[in-house]
Structure formats: structure tokens, C-alpha cells
Amino acid sequence: MAGGRPHLKRSFSIIPCFVFVESVLLGIVVLLAYRLEFTDTFPVHTQGFFCYDSAYAKPYPGPEAASRAPPALIYALVTAGPTLTILLGELARAFFPAPPSSSPVSGESTIVSGACCRFSPPLRRLVRFLGVYSFGLFTTTIFANAGQVVTGNPTPHFLSVCRPNYTALGCPPPSPDRPGPDRFVTDQSACAGSPSLVAAARRAFPCKDAALCAYAVTYTAMYVTLVFRVKGSRLVKPSLCLALLCPAFLVGVVRVAEYRNHWSDVLAGFLTGAAIATFLVTCVVHNFQSRPHSGRRLSPWEDLSQAPTMDSPLEKNPRPAGRIRHRHGSPHPSRRTVPAVAT
């Protein structure tokens, strides 16, 4: 920005790239997430279990909607929370800009596309950050669902919904001589319970709810830390970030306390979501900072007098005028002396 006027940049590829590239990629990610979540296009791996295994014999906690952290609440939080935070942050940044001395050079340009479309820096930042967040949210869903489909790890209440016939499977009941399980069941028809409940009970690792919460919290906390400017206090931003981390931690605790997931499932979900958010913030949106403007090429019809000039190295480092060096390397004074003539 020079003289109070924003830097303008003309681009005819921003709208086609957004419509035909980024929107298409986002649609593919959404479609794949839907296929993994709500269809049987990718069947869940059938993993065996030990007879009377206490790790999978917890009571059935009921449907997911009856949980203290139901999926509807989690989806609403991971969608509305980061969106409102980023929206408020960008509005505050646009209407109350920081002084140049306390913030890096923005370098954002107002992009003009065609004769009518003009994209200001606040609008571009808002679309960029929310678009990348949406892409990462569905990517996290894909990673979590793919892990559940491939591994097929049972939940802690798996045997309660499976209801296997141990007598028909040849599983003797535990006794003092055999305190632990001694037979591993791999028969796919061993479960007599509801097929839908059994299929849902085979999708424990990693915990999808924990992954989504960790992704949303990490992305939002990094935005608060890197974008928000608070003067006179060092505890405001850490307090906000810890307040954001608390619900995600509580979701993991609820999943374990209700026997819906193991601790290992929750931890794997936390790591998956946090890793995806960290990658997107660091490598895609560049820590929510704008790249400095690096200049542009002059068009052929522009005046060459506007081109940047370069100083000559001879002007920067002039040769000393006091002494010169002989061609054989012996120095001698630069002032010429007239030889004496014998008379």
C-alpha cells in the first residue's frame, strides 16, 4: 500500500481455478467421506476375538445419540466454533488493523478479475482460511473412517452386541485352571446380534469424534495464537487456547467412560486430527500470514524509467586513487615524476 491506495493485481485465473480445481477437489473429498461414513462401499474388516475377553465385554451404552457427547453436538461445535472465531478475527483485523511497526508486511493485493469482480484482502483471507479448514475437516473424517474400515478393531462393548454362542463355537467357560481366554474366534458368522450394531462395534480405531475435535481445536488454537494481538497481557491467548482444548479432552474422556472406545483409540484420534491441522496451518496457509509482495514484471508498453535500478559494484567499491599497481605487481606512486637530465 503506497500513499493510502491498495495495491491492485489483475488475475484472470482466480475464478476458473476456484471453480474448476479447488471446488472439484473439495467435492471429491466430501464424496469420499460420505462413501466411507454412510455406505458399505468399503466393507469393514472382520477381526477375530478371544472367547470371554474382558476387554470387549463391557455393557452396551446405547445408541450414539444417547451419549453425553452426541454426534450432532460434536458436528455443530467443530463447524460453528472455528467458523465464528475466524470470522470475528478477520473482521477485527480488517476494521482495527495493527500498526505497521507491530505487524509484518501484509503484501496482500486486491485482485481484479474481469471488469466487475474485485477480491479484497480480507475477503480472500476469509475464504482461504475457511476453505482450507473445511477441506481438512473432511480429510480428517476420511482418515478416521479409513482407519476404522481397515483395522476393524472392536469396541469395549463388542461382545455385548455380538452375543456369540460360545457353546457352538467350542469356547469353554473360564475356570480357575483357565482364568483367561484360550480360543480365538475368526468365524464371520459367530455373532448372533444385530448386524448394524455389530458393524458399528467393529469401528473403534481411531476414534473419529476425537480426531474431529482435535483437528478443530488445533486449527482454531493456532489461529488465535498466530493472528490475535493482545497488548499488555501474556495470559489472554493461552487462556483462550486452553479453553478450546478442554471440550476436546472431555469428549475423549466421555468416549472412554461410556465404553465406546479404548484409550488407545482416543489417543490415535487426537494425534490424527492434530497432525492434519498442523500440516495445513504450517504448509498450506503459512501460519495465517501473508506472503510479502515480491514485485512484478514490467509490461512492454510501460515506461522503462519505472524499472528498478541497480547500483554498479564499481560505484560501491571504487578503487583507491592514491596508489596504482604495476603490471608486474610492484606498487609505485600514481604521480608521475620527470627524470632528471644530466647536463
UniProtKB/Swiss-Prot annotation:
A single cellular component GO annotation: plasma membrane
Region forming the signal peptide: none
Compositionally biased spans, kind Basic residues: 322-335
CDD domains per the UniProt record, alphabetical: PAP2_wunen
InterPro entries: P_Acid_Pase_2/haloperoxi_sf (IPR036938), P_Acid_Pase_2/haloperoxidase (IPR000326), PA_PP_rel (IPR043216)
Residues annotated as transmembrane: 12-32, 72-92, 129-149, 210-230, 239-259, 266-286
Similarity field: Belongs to the PA-phosphatase related phosphoesterase family.
Protein name: Phospholipid phosphatase-related protein type 2
Organism expressing this protein natively: Rattus norvegicus
Organism placement in taxonomy: Eukaryota, Metazoa, Chordata, Craniata, Vertebrata
